[in-house]
């Protein structure tokens, strides 16, 4: 049991070193919320209820320190409702216009093929992907092709994140069942211990 605890403490230490620091994570979250509020507040979207949310590693809490001189990559989606008639190019151009004239992000905007990138000075950038809802119940969306000419690729960042969370919980439950069945020397893991072990890998 002592060996198991020692091994876990080493793994947890490694995970904590790989993660975004709490201060940088807080800063990234605040900046994401600022951009989301700025976009939604634009008059163009006064009658359109946008949905904005993180995707990828930032949503899953699996963001790790990049190699060499690379930056942290924070991704989020600006999602139009199902009945919206706005094209990918129109939504993309509105995001660019808003951020280039909001008094904060003017010189930080970089145009990418399928997303708008905001570059920050402290080693991370934020990629904003246009999207449109396909099925609000299943969270399926459609995102643009590389030319931003049409809604083309189907995606489901929220659905994948929910699946990932369930798999992580299932893995811990299976692990507990395994040890409970085959090793009578292993102490019962409390719910709090399970959460503390799971969190750094999410």
Give the label of every model feature segment.
Residues 21, 25, 42, 135, ...:
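Short, structured coil/loop segments at alpha-helix boundaries
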Residues 75:
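Glycine- and aspartate-rich repeat motifs characteristic of hemolysin/RTX-like Ca2+-binding segments
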Residues 1-71, 80-90, 94, 115-118:
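N-terminal regions immediately upstream of nucleotidyltransferase
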Residues 1-15, 156-160, 167-202:
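Nucleotidyltransferase catalytic cores
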Residues 39, 43, 92-151, 155-185:
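Conserved catalytic core of two-metal-ion nucleotidyltransferases
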Residues 78-80, 145:
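Short, charged/polar low-complexity linear motifs in solvent-exposed/disordered segments
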